[in-house]
């Protein structure tokens, strides 16, 4: 693809805190989206990963391949209106995850 599609990523600890928040606050709904409200392009994600891991090579995208859905972003309005928001941005989440992998894998 081109790297242009927009996506949303959520750090796993933020998901765990969201579940705890939902249970402790007795939030009831048929559907509760848990999102970061931070959308980034696949290109931005690749650049961020490249920076975190110290990769010095070139990022190559193949525009002959499909991009898929141009935008995937959750509507987290319900949970945000109750006072919960993700605390870990993408950059910090990648740093934490990469550090964990280096120490444990």
Go through each PLM region and give its residues.
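C-terminal substrate-binding subdomain of Rossmann-fold SDR/epimerase-dehydratase oxidoreductases
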Residues: 1-105
